[in-house]
Amino acid sequence: MRLIIKLIKFLEDLTLLTLRIFPAETAKNITLRLLKLIYNLNLISLFASGNIKKSKINIKNLSLKNRIGIAGGLDKNAEYFHIFSSLGFSFVEVGTVTLEPQTGNPKPRIFRFTKDKTLVNSLGFNNVGSVQVLNNIKKYKPKFDGVLGISIGKSKNTKTKNAWQDYLHLMDYFYFEADYLAINISSPNTENLRELSSQENLEFLLEKISQKKVQLIDMYKKNTPIFVKLSPDETEENLKNLIEVSEKNSIDGF
C-alpha cells in the first residue's frame, strides 16, 4: 500500500511538472481529460480525498454534505461535474452557459503567476451553448452525487436592453435540472455585461426573472433557488443598492 501511495505521489509530481510546459489553458484541458480517463478506468478512488470534513450544511433548502465545492468556470460545458462529486466535492456549479455556442475571447486568455501560485482568466463565456450543455447534464446527472448549480449569462452579441430575454430562455432550459441557478452579471470578460449591475438595469432584469420563476414553480412544482453573482469590485454604496433590489425581487442569495 505504501508503494502505491508513493507511486501516485510520484505521478502527481511528474504530471504537474509536465503540464507547466504547456500554456495554461492547454494544461487545464489536458488535466480535465486525464481526470475523465482516470474516472472511466474506475481509478478515481485513488485520488479522492478522505480528509474533507463532512460537516453538513443547509442553505436555502440545499443540503450540502460539506463546505467545499467547485465554483463556476471550471466545468463550463457540464462534462465533468459527476467526476468532481466522486472526488468528494459537495456542489459543482457548471457554466457560465449562454443560449448559443460561443468561442469566448482570443487566446491566450488564461495567465499563470507562478510566484503567487495563481491563475487569471479572461475566457469570456466560451461554451458549447444551452442545448448541448443540457444534453450533457441529462447524460451525467444520474452519476452525480451532490448539489448542481448552473450559471447562466447573456451572449456576447446580445444588447444590454435585450439581455433579460437570454436569461429567461436559459431559465426555461435549466430551471428543472438545476438545484440552483446563478445569474451571472459580474464577469469583466464579457462586453457590456456589467451594465446589467446598474440599479435600473438590474431592477428590470430581476423583476423579469422573478416573474418567470413564479411561472416555473407552477409548471414544475419545484422551487429552484436563484442567486445573483455580484462583482467584488462594486463600491459599498452600489452593493447595498444591488442587494436591496435583489431582496425586493425575492432573489435567494448572492
Residue ranges of predicted features:
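Short, Lys/Arg-enriched, disordered terminal segments
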Residues: 1-9
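N-terminal amphipathic alpha-helix/helix-capping segment at the start of soluble metabolic enzymes
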Residues: 4-5, 46-70, 132-145
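An N-cap/entry alpha-helix motif that binds or orients negatively charged groups
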Residues: 10-57, 118-126, 130
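Active-site cofactor/substrate anionic-group-binding motifs, chiefly glycine-
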Residues: 63-64, 69, 73, 80-100
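Short, conserved acidic/polar surface loops in the N-terminal third of protein domains
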Residues: 80-84, 102-109, 160-163
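A gly/proline- and charged-residue-enriched helix-loop-helix capping module
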Residues: 95-145
